[in-house]
Amino acid sequence: MKKKALTISCIVLLALIGTLTGGSLYMLNYSLRPENRGKDLQGSMEYMMQNYPQLKPWVDSLQQHHALKDTFITAPDGIRLHAYYAYASRPSRRTAVIVHGYTDNAIRIFQIGYLYNHSLDYNVLIPDLRYSGLSEGEDFQMGWLDRKDVIQWIDTAPALFG
Protein backbone atom coordinates (compact mmCIF):
# COMPACT_ATOMS: atom_id res chain seq x y z
CA MET A 1 0.00 0.00 0.00
CA LYS A 2 2.81 2.40 0.89
CA LYS A 3 4.57 1.60 -2.37
CA LYS A 4 1.44 2.38 -4.38
CA ALA A 5 0.89 5.70 -2.53
CA LEU A 6 4.55 6.63 -3.07
CA THR A 7 4.28 5.83 -6.80
CA ILE A 8 1.12 7.92 -7.16
CA SER A 9 2.71 10.78 -5.20
CA CYS A 10 5.78 10.70 -7.46
CA ILE A 11 3.61 10.72 -10.60
CA VAL A 12 1.55 13.67 -9.30
CA LEU A 13 4.71 15.52 -8.28
CA LEU A 14 6.33 14.95 -11.69
CA ALA A 15 3.14 16.07 -13.46
CA LEU A 16 3.03 19.19 -11.30
CA ILE A 17 6.71 19.97 -11.96
CA GLY A 18 6.19 19.40 -15.70
CA THR A 19 3.14 21.66 -15.77
CA LEU A 20 4.89 24.43 -13.84
CA THR A 21 8.02 24.20 -16.00
CA GLY A 22 6.01 24.21 -19.24
CA GLY A 23 3.85 27.10 -18.07
CA SER A 24 6.87 29.09 -16.94
CA LEU A 25 8.67 28.61 -20.25
CA TYR A 26 5.53 29.61 -22.13
CA MET A 27 5.11 32.79 -20.06
CA LEU A 28 8.79 33.67 -20.44
CA ASN A 29 8.54 33.30 -24.21
CA TYR A 30 5.26 35.25 -24.24
CA SER A 31 6.73 38.16 -22.27
CA LEU A 32 10.10 38.36 -24.04
CA ARG A 33 8.83 37.71 -27.56
CA PRO A 34 5.40 39.33 -27.84
CA GLU A 35 4.08 40.54 -31.17
CA ASN A 36 6.86 42.86 -32.26
CA ARG A 37 5.19 45.93 -33.68
CA GLY A 38 8.51 47.68 -33.10
CA LYS A 39 9.95 46.10 -36.26
CA ASP A 40 7.08 47.41 -38.43
CA LEU A 41 8.54 50.79 -39.37
CA GLN A 42 5.98 51.60 -42.07
CA GLY A 43 3.10 50.64 -39.79
CA SER A 44 4.61 52.73 -37.00
CA MET A 45 4.84 55.81 -39.24
CA GLU A 46 1.24 55.29 -40.41
CA TYR A 47 0.14 54.95 -36.77
CA MET A 48 1.90 58.19 -35.83
CA MET A 49 0.46 60.16 -38.74
CA GLN A 50 -3.03 58.82 -38.10
CA ASN A 51 -3.01 59.47 -34.34
CA TYR A 52 -0.85 62.60 -34.30
CA PRO A 53 -1.56 64.48 -37.56
CA GLN A 54 0.17 67.61 -36.23
CA LEU A 55 3.48 65.70 -36.62
CA LYS A 56 3.24 65.45 -40.40
CA PRO A 57 4.56 68.97 -41.20
CA TRP A 58 7.40 68.54 -38.69
CA VAL A 59 8.45 65.09 -39.95
CA ASP A 60 8.07 66.18 -43.60
CA SER A 61 10.22 69.25 -42.95
CA LEU A 62 12.91 67.21 -41.19
CA GLN A 63 12.97 64.69 -44.03
CA GLN A 64 12.92 67.35 -46.76
CA HIS A 65 15.90 69.15 -45.23
CA HIS A 66 17.67 65.88 -44.35
CA ALA A 67 17.54 66.99 -40.73
CA LEU A 68 16.22 63.69 -39.37
CA LYS A 69 19.37 61.62 -39.25
CA ASP A 70 20.24 58.03 -38.39
CA THR A 71 23.16 56.85 -36.35
CA PHE A 72 24.34 53.50 -35.03
CA ILE A 73 26.47 52.44 -32.09
CA THR A 74 27.69 49.01 -31.07
CA ALA A 75 26.93 47.77 -27.57
CA PRO A 76 29.71 46.01 -25.64
CA ASP A 77 28.14 42.63 -26.48
CA GLY A 78 28.35 43.38 -30.22
CA ILE A 79 24.68 44.26 -30.85
CA ARG A 80 24.21 47.15 -33.31
CA LEU A 81 21.85 49.80 -31.98
CA HIS A 82 20.08 52.49 -34.01
CA ALA A 83 18.78 55.96 -33.19
CA TYR A 84 17.22 58.91 -34.96
CA TYR A 85 18.42 62.37 -34.09
CA ALA A 86 17.60 65.95 -35.02
CA TYR A 87 19.25 69.24 -34.17
CA ALA A 88 17.45 72.12 -32.52
CA SER A 89 16.57 75.02 -34.85
CA ARG A 90 19.60 76.93 -33.53
CA PRO A 91 22.75 75.70 -31.77
CA SER A 92 21.83 74.42 -28.33
CA ARG A 93 23.50 72.58 -25.48
CA ARG A 94 20.13 71.13 -24.45
CA THR A 95 19.55 67.57 -25.58
CA ALA A 96 16.69 65.21 -24.82
CA VAL A 97 17.27 61.46 -25.05
CA ILE A 98 13.77 60.06 -25.53
CA VAL A 99 13.26 56.34 -24.95
CA HIS A 100 10.24 54.39 -26.24
CA GLY A 101 8.24 51.81 -24.35
CA TYR A 102 8.03 48.03 -24.40
CA THR A 103 7.43 46.54 -27.89
CA ASP A 104 7.51 49.99 -29.53
CA ASN A 105 10.19 51.73 -31.57
CA ALA A 106 11.62 55.22 -31.91
CA ILE A 107 9.06 56.24 -34.54
CA ARG A 108 6.19 55.54 -32.16
CA ILE A 109 7.57 58.13 -29.72
CA PHE A 110 8.11 60.92 -32.28
CA GLN A 111 5.27 62.90 -30.70
CA ILE A 112 7.46 63.42 -27.62
CA GLY A 113 10.43 64.25 -29.85
CA TYR A 114 8.24 66.85 -31.54
CA LEU A 115 7.51 68.54 -28.22
CA TYR A 116 11.17 68.74 -27.28
CA ASN A 117 12.51 69.64 -30.73
CA HIS A 118 9.80 71.88 -32.16
CA SER A 119 8.23 73.38 -29.05
CA LEU A 120 11.18 73.54 -26.63
CA ASP A 121 14.00 73.77 -29.22
CA TYR A 122 16.05 70.86 -27.87
CA ASN A 123 18.33 68.57 -29.82
CA VAL A 124 16.63 65.17 -29.73
CA LEU A 125 18.09 61.67 -29.77
CA ILE A 126 15.51 58.88 -30.06
CA PRO A 127 17.05 55.39 -29.89
CA ASP A 128 15.52 52.10 -30.94
CA LEU A 129 16.03 49.72 -28.04
CA ARG A 130 17.18 46.15 -28.65
CA TYR A 131 14.93 44.07 -30.92
CA SER A 132 13.07 47.25 -31.98
CA GLY A 133 13.16 49.36 -35.11
CA LEU A 134 16.50 49.12 -36.89
CA SER A 135 18.37 47.84 -33.82
CA GLU A 136 19.53 44.25 -33.63
CA GLY A 137 18.66 41.78 -30.91
CA GLU A 138 16.73 38.57 -30.45
CA ASP A 139 14.54 39.48 -27.47
CA PHE A 140 13.13 42.47 -25.67
CA GLN A 141 15.28 43.10 -22.62
CA MET A 142 12.57 44.56 -20.38
CA GLY A 143 15.04 47.26 -19.34
CA TRP A 144 17.91 45.12 -18.07
CA LEU A 145 20.42 45.63 -20.88
CA ASP A 146 18.53 48.67 -22.17
CA ARG A 147 19.66 50.71 -19.17
CA LYS A 148 23.29 50.31 -20.21
CA ASP A 149 22.42 51.05 -23.83
CA VAL A 150 20.68 54.30 -22.85
CA ILE A 151 23.74 55.36 -20.84
CA GLN A 152 25.86 54.65 -23.92
CA TRP A 153 23.49 56.82 -26.00
CA ILE A 154 23.74 59.62 -23.42
CA ASP A 155 27.53 59.40 -23.65
CA THR A 156 27.27 59.52 -27.47
CA ALA A 157 25.02 62.61 -27.58
CA PRO A 158 27.78 65.24 -27.10
CA ALA A 159 29.66 63.85 -30.11
CA LEU A 160 26.50 64.12 -32.23
CA PHE A 161 25.43 67.59 -31.15
CA GLY A 162 28.78 69.19 -30.30
For the regions a protein language model found, what residue spans apply to each?
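The serine-hydrolase catalytic nucleophile loop
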Residues: Y102-L115
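Conserved alpha/beta-hydrolase
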Residues: Y116-E136
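An N-terminal hydrophobic leader/cap segment in hydrolases
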Residues: A5, L16-F72
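Histidine-centered divalent metal-coordination motifs
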Residues: H82, H100-G101, S132
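A short loop-to-beta-strand scaffold at the N-terminal edge of the catalytic core in hydrolase folds
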Residues: P76-Y87
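Conserved catalytic-core motifs of eukaryotic protein kinase domains, centered on the activation segment
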Residues: R108-F110, S135-E138
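Alpha/beta-hydrolase active-site loop
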Residues: F140-F161
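Short beta-strand element of the alpha/beta-hydrolase
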Residues: R93-G101
